[in-house]
């Protein structure tokens, strides 16, 4: 082993050898359960102690799980066995299970995985329990669990050893069960709306579809540089060109950026695209879908986050980005006529900007630095500047802005969507402008994607598209303060 064993570990190794000496497999085999702990409680907790005595002949059950508590001396003892659904008490008596199985019970340690067959009864205190008729060791645990009263206190250890966190922290288990349900309800909602789930490549020849730094890899056989995808977007829009009119993909995306409570280098997104729709339709879909998910998974569209009630049930606010900035700062960007004027306003209001930034970038900085964190209740911010929205369609009434929106809840972006740019000539011009930005030092600017331009030249119908960061949505719906709380195995720095 890579570390010195402590006394408890040595004792468990000795017990392991004793089991082998007795011809007992310490790592067991299949065990047929009659149900989970919750199933037993649902079926039998309704009866009184006396009624369970009368029904004993019909109450034979079989459960399996991990020993979490153990007490008792002499010829009988109690324990709590934990499975996916929770815990249930067991009662083991020597005259019920026999000498050999009672010896197994006496030598069992906390953390061991056991199987119990028996009948249901209630103790004098009214706790529903299983009276063991047969006790089986299924897996010998060679390491002691964290202290049962204090659990796993080191937050970093919880992330590094998620399996221990799940064993000792019921809230963590509930969070990840709900994460699975959230994704399932998202699928159910979209499938019922006629969307088709698809799969597209994770390794791209060009890093496109978002403003982000990619991870770079190399294909040895082809001697080719490839990029882990930073977005799913451009492949899905190729499918819209091909006639798949309503598509979505749920998958991993990779961005070579910082790690924080909101960011992980790999994360899960859903992107969807609907032909013959625009960003207003996608706004309606987003609101309806998130509300549906909350109701189905949590039973309510009013959720608690960090002590605040977030109302997903009422109609969500819709606010143009210029109006949002004006409300917060008094600056009306409709009246700003030049980049120089925008830069002067930024200096006046203490907005940090780069020298290369234009009108649209500066408006966005005003929003991010003065408005974003104030948007606690669900708010659609729409009308983003063209300079920062290279894949979105320009607004026909004011081409400085696009038909795009972002969804903000609890001061964080949760979704990004727009009426897709389907004009190949305009799209090529936008890509060329991005190349200029890249040459000026913007590492997150888009590359030119000639193949995507060619696809657009065959004709893409008017289309609405949406991207949602699933991890942030799960954070919201599970009241989790950090993205690491909703990722089973978040990225951690090497020790």
Swiss-Prot record:
It catalyses: tRNA(Lys) + L-lysine + ATP = L-lysyl-tRNA(Lys) + AMP + diphosphate. Mg(2+) 2 binds at residue 413. It comes from the Bacteria. Pfam families: tRNA-synt_2, tRNA_anti-codon. SUPFAM superfamilies: Class II aaRS and biotin synthetases, Nucleic acid-binding proteins. Its EC number is 6.1.1.6. Keywords: Aminoacyl-tRNA synthetase, ATP-binding, Cytoplasm, Ligase, Magnesium, Metal-binding, Nucleotide-binding, Protein biosynthesis. Its cofactor is Mg(2+). The keyword Membrane does not apply. InterPro entries: Aa-tRNA-synt_II (IPR004364), aa-tRNA-synth_II (IPR006195), aa-tRNA-synth_II/BPL/LPL (IPR045864), Lys-tRNA-ligase_II (IPR002313), Lys-tRNA-ligase_II_bac/euk (IPR034762), Lys-tRNA-ligase_II_N (IPR044136), Lys-tRNA-synth_II_C (IPR018149), NA-bd_OB-fold (IPR012340). One of its GO terms (cellular component) is cytosol. Binds 3 Mg(2+) ions per subunit. It is found in: Cytoplasm. GO terms for molecular function: ATP binding; catalytic activity, acting on a protein; lysine-tRNA ligase activity; magnesium ion binding; transferase activity; tRNA binding. Belongs to the class-II aminoacyl-tRNA synthetase family. PANTHER family: LYSINE--TRNA LIGASE, CHLOROPLASTIC_MITOCHONDRIAL, LYSYL-TRNA SYNTHETASE. Homodimer. This is Lysine--tRNA ligase. It comes from Staphylococcus aureus (strain MSSA476). The gene is lysS.
